[in-house]
Amino acid sequence: MKLYHYTKFSNFCSIWIQQKLKFSEWTNSNDVYEREKIYNFTQHSKEYKGKMFTSEVFHQFVQNVYKEVEHYKQISFCLDYEEFEGYASPMMWGHYARDYQRSGVCLEIDSSKIKFPQIPKIYRKKVSYRKNLTPTHVGGVDAEMKNAAELFVVKNRNNLFFKKHWHWKYENEYRIVSKECEELDISGAITSVYVLGEDNVTLQSISHIIMDSEKVGFLNVGGLRSLKLNSMNLYEYNSIQEEIKYINEKGGLS
């Protein structure tokens, strides 16, 4: 499966050198409804197997769940769309290449080559989108148990981490979530690097960084049209740049 990770050029440099993706704080999610559904706990039940909890115990449990959720981190990817491949999303490029230098970068990653650790635990899944996000109801758990909050979050992870509001559907997101993992080893998993336009500074900079690599190719994106530049020497690269210029002058690729 192909995964696409959009990022800034400055971040790409670090990713390429280290061959790792860093997990980001889950609380930095761009979907306010996603965060709100976690903090909108409904007092579904204070009873568990005939045991009734006091309001103080129940309130403390909810607070512990808040804290537990905030310990989780995530890495977000984009999947292929029905109409086009994941690297060619106009809205995703609008987020990451909107400056005048169009300095956004998209990495194509072969998911089968990602080195997922056995420990700590990692959860990964395609995000589903809902027009109405329901809160995660607190109930069916012994609130006085020492690790009650931890078990509750694991049990309800699909609703907590893998559902977003319908308005974010264009992201077509695939998400990797972990509580303890700080970075993901993607050495050997990057198959292509994508930039927006053949005449921007970002493409020139990337060419100097990975020109000698046989693992990665360049993809020039003009709208939804593309021309792939595989690893090559500088002469071949410049020759194809002239070809791109000629194609664009003639009205683009057919």
Give the location of each predicted region.
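Partner-binding and oligomerization surfaces adjacent to conserved cores of proteins
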Residues: M1-S254
